[in-house]
Amino acid sequence: MPDVEWIMENCHMMRDNGCWGGEKQISYASPDGQYTYYINKRKDGTYYLHGACKHYGRT
């Protein structure tokens, strides 16, 4: 899995998913279109990778 900084610099921000458990979540699409990464922003302002989803069947 790529790190948060790489995702935020190289991936396309798809949408703001709002707040989940007090943390803001943003979806990013990988450059090759195979993955969606979910980045959460903690209340202290730091970011972390919450999860990823692979899109099967895309080339």
Residue map of PLM features:
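Acidic, low-complexity, intrinsically disordered interaction modules
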Residues: 12-59
